[in-house]
C-alpha cells in the first residue's frame, strides 16, 4: 500500500493557472489533508520511475484513509478530491457555473501555447465554448438525434462485423483488439460526419486512417509519461519524453487535417458536417471541432468496448442473458461496465466562485477532482461493488431486490451538467450495436483474462493487449 501511495505522489501535477489556496470554515476540523512530501523528495520519486499508471488506485487508497473529501498538494497546487456521490452531483448541477472550467493535461496546454494550434470544444472556454457547445447540443443531444446517428453507427459496425466473420470462420485469435476497436470508433465518427453517403475508399485512405488512429493512441501514452515532470523543463531541454509527445500530436493533427480534407470532398453528405454548415458555423471553427471530435472518439469508446468484452468473457452467463433478452438487456451491461471501468476515472472542474462543498468553504479557482472510479466501487452506493451484475440497473429484475444499495448517480461516466460528454448518444449507440452484433454472431473469450488489470493512461485502459479468441457461431 505504501508503495502505491508513493507512486501516486509522482503522478499528478497541474498547470500553474490552476494554483490556488483553499481555506475552510468548519468549526471542528479542517479538510483532511494528505501529508506533502518535500519538493526534492517528490522529484526523486519521479525519477525513480512512476508514470502515473496506478493513479486510480492511489487516489482510491487516499479516500479509504482520509474519507470522501480530502486535499492534497502536488508541487504548489492544492487539489480537492471528492468521492461522495451527492457532492459530485452537486458539483456538476449547482457549482460548475455557466461556463464550466476543467483541468487539461499540462503537456496539451503547453503545446497549444507554443505552437498556436487552436483546438476544439475540449480546449475552449467561456463564451466561445458556450456558443459552439449549444450548436453541438442541438445536433447531437436532442431526441431526434438518435435516428440519424443510429443509421450511421449500424452501417459502420455491420461492415466491421462482416470483416471479422470472414477472418474467423474457423476461429482466430485477435492479439490487439484495442487497435481494431480504435479504428472502428474512428470510422463510426467519420460516418456520423458524412451521414448516408459512403466514406472515401481505397488503400491510400485506409493507410491514412490506420496511421491516424495509431498516432492518437500514442498521444495518450506519451502524455502519461509526462505526469509529474515539469513540462516546461522537458520542452526547454528538449528531452526525449517531450519530443515523443510533440511528434505524436504533430502527426495526429497533420493526419486529422488530411482526413478532414478527404471527407470534405464527399458530395451530398447528410451528416454532422452538413448540419454544422446549416447552423452557419464558420469553416475554421468547424475544422477545429471536427478534428478533436475524431481524436476523442477513439480512446473513449474503444476502451469501453474492450472492457465490456473482457467482462463478458469473465462472466459468460451474461452473454446468455444478452442472447435471451436481446437489446433490452444491453444498456444494463454498458452501465455496469462503465461503473467498474470508467474510461475517465477522474472528472474535473474549476470552481467559478467561492462555494460550500460539503461542510467546507472553498475558494474560487479551486480545482476539484471527482473520483468516479472510487465512487463507482463504494459499497455504500452499490452492493457487491466488485462484481459485474448488469441486472442491478434493471428495475424490473427480481434479483435487484437482493442488492440493498444502488445510487445511480454515484456512477457518472459521461459526467453531468453543461460540460457533460457531448458525444454520449453516439457512444451509447455504438456500444449497444457492437455488443449485440458480436454476441449474436460470435463465440468469444478473452484468453489472457486473469492477467488483465486496469491502469491509468489518461483513460482507464488494460495493462496489456487483450487477446480475443473469436469464432463464428454455428460455423
Regions found by a protein language model. Give the residues of each.
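C-terminal helix/juxtamembrane-tail motif
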Residues: 61, 444, 458-475
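N-terminal membrane-proximal hinge/A-helix region immediately C-terminal to the signal-anchor transmembrane segment
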Residues: 2-115, 130-131, 154-159, 410
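Cytochrome P450 heme-thiolate "Cys pocket" and heme-binding signature region
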Residues: 396-431, 454-457
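Cytochrome P450 heme-thiolate monooxygenase catalytic core
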Residues: 101-113, 147-305
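Conserved cytochrome P450 K-helix/beta-meander segment immediately N-terminal to the heme-binding cysteine loop
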Residues: 370-401
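Conserved cytochrome P450 K-helix E-x-x-R motif and the immediately C-terminal K′/meander segment
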Residues: 44-67, 254, 258-262, 324-360, ...
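Cytochrome P450 heme-binding "Cys pocket" and the immediately downstream C-terminal segment
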Residues: 424-461
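Cytochrome P450 catalytic-core helices
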Residues: 300-319, 323, 425-440
Amino acid at each position: 500500500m505504501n508503495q502505491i501511495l508513493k507512486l501516486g505522489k509522482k503522478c499528478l501535477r497541474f498547470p500553474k493557472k490552476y494554483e490556488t489556496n483553499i481555506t475552510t470554515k468548519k468549526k471542528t476540523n479542517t479538510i483532511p489533508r494528505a501529508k506533502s512530501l518535500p519538493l526534492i523528495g517528490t522529484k526523486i520519486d519521479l525519477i525513480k520511475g512512476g508514470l502515473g499508471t496506478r493513479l486510480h488506485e492511489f487516489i482510491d487508497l487516499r479516500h479509504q484513509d482520509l474519507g470522501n473529501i480530502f486535499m492534497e498538494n502536488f508541487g504548489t497546487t492544492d487539489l480537492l478530491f471528492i468521492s461522495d456521490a451527492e457532492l459530485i452531483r452537486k458539483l456538476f448541477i449547482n457549482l460548475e457555473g455557466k461556463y464550466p472550467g476543467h483541468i487539461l493535461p499540462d503537456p496539451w496546454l503547453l503545446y497549444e501555447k507554443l505552437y498556436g494550434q487552436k483546438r476544439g470544444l475540449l480546449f475552449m472556454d467561456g463564451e466561445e465554448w458556450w456558443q459552439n457547445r449549444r450548436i453541438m447540443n442541438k445536433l447531437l443531444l436532442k431526441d431526434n438525434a438518435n435516428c440519424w446517428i443510429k443509421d450511421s453507427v449500424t452501417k459502420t459496425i455491420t461492415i466491421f462485423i462482416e470483416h471479422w466473420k470472414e477472418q474467423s470462420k474457423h476461429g482466430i485469435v485477435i492479439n490487439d483488439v484495442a487497435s481494431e476497436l480504435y479504428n472502428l470508433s474512428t470510422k463510426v465518427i467519420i460516418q456520423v460526419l458524412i451521414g448516408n453517403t459512403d466514406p472515401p475508399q481505397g488503400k491510400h485512405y485506409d493507410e491514412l486512417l490506420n496511421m491516424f488512429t495509431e498516432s492518437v493512441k500514442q498521444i495518450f501514452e506519451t502524455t502519461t509519461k509526462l505526469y509529474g515532470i515539469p513540462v516546461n523543463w522537458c520542452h526547454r531541454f528538449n528531452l526525449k519524453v517531450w519530443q515523443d509527445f510533440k511528434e505524436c500530436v504533430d502527426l495526429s493533427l497533420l493526419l486529422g487535417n488530411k482526413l478532414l480534407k478527404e471527407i470534405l470532398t464527399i458530395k451530398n453528405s447528410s451528416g454532422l458536417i452538413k448540419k454544422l454548415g446549416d447552423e452557419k458555423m464558420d469553416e475554421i471553427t468547424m475544422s477545429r471541432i471536427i478534428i478533436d471530435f475524431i481524436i476523442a472518439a477513439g480512446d473513449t469508446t474503444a476502451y469501453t468496448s474492450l472492457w465490456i468484452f473482457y467482462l463478458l468473457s469473465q462472466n459468460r452467463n451474461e452473454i446468455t442473458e444478452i442472447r435471451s433478452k436481446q437489446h433490452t438487456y444491453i444498456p444494463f451491461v454498458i452501465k455496469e461496465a462503465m461503473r467498474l471501468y470508467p474510461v475517465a476515472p477522474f472528472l474535473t472542474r474549476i470552481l467559478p466562485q467561492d462555494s460550500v462543498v460539503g461542510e467546507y468553504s472553498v475558494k474560487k479557482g479551486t480545482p476539484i477532482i471527482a473520483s468516479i472510479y472510487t465512487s463507482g466501487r463504494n459499497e455504500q452506493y452499490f452492493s457487491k461493488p466488485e462484481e459485474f451484475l448488469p441486472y442491478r440497473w434493471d428495475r424490473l429484475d427480481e434479483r435487484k431486490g437482493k442488492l440493498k444499495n444502488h445510487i445511480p448517480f454515484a456512477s457518472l461516466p459521461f459526467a453531468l451538467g453543461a460540460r457533460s460528454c457531448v458525444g454520449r448518444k453516439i457512444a451509447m449507440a455504438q456500444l449497444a450495436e457492437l455488443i449485440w452484433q458480436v454476441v449474436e454472431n460470435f463465440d468469444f473469450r478473452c484468453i489472457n483474462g486473469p492477467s488483465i488489470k486496469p491502469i491509468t493512461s489518461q483513460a482507464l485502459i488494460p495493462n496489456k493487449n487483450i487477446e480475443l479468441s473469436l469464432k463464428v457461431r454455428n460455423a
